[in-house]
Amino acid sequence: MDKKDITAQIYNLLDETAAYIEHTTWRNKYSLALKSLQDELKAPCVLAVAGKVKAGKSFLVNALLGVDIAMTGTTETTATVNIFKKGIPPSKEKPILCVFLDGHKEWVSKQYLDSLQGTSKESLERTDKIDRLIMYINDNPLLDYVTLVDTPGIGAEVGEDGDSHQIQTDAYFNLRERHQQDTINLSNTADAIIYLFNTVPTETDKNFLASLYNGGHGITSLNGIGVLSKVDKDLTQIENISHFCK
């Protein structure tokens, strides 16, 4: 029996259960929960990619998708929560739905997404108003089963990119604090998470992973995967693999 057969059986069982309680006192208490479970069965698995700044999250997202979509670089690039999912956008020129914090939505281009990355004053002013960006892709087989979430890095250090303007630094810290909480929230509510390390685990890594474990949303060793990135740049990292298992 394959996965589709099992899913169909569970879906039908939920249907039968909903029909059974339709005319009972249980209806008001359980009908919405049953419908929610059916919706989850039909939805793709949500896989969040998290990790410290410059750990290689966007490189991994591009590798999983098989195309260069997520912007990458040697400095911090992902400054927004970027979601890649199955779907047909209204136009090829503007395939990304930008959801603002005030609830406003607007279709934007890939160039607009790229303009949000980094820590310049202009980028900070734009990203400060954005909740998330959703890129719809219709011809990628992976997205039939998985919705990928590229999250902002955690543990950023202001000044790494030559930023010395106090107002910009304060804005960066405020935005980073919100994005770090967004990353924790998204990772806690995702079906699975890939966490990237590129060095011996730090307190930042440990605290973040502890927040997932204690979050009560089901991220465990079964659906949480740790990935040691950039080992080709420093093969001695492999010798320290025991540090990652503690």
Show where each model-derived region lies:
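Long amphipathic alpha-helical scaffold segments
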Residues: T24-P44
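Globular "head" domains of long coiled-coil molecular machines
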Residues: A8-D15, Q38-K246
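Charged, amphipathic alpha-helical linker segments immediately N-terminal to NTP-binding catalytic cores
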Residues: M1-T25
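Membrane-targeting and insertion segments and their boundary/processing signals
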Residues: K4, R27-Y30, L34, K54-S58
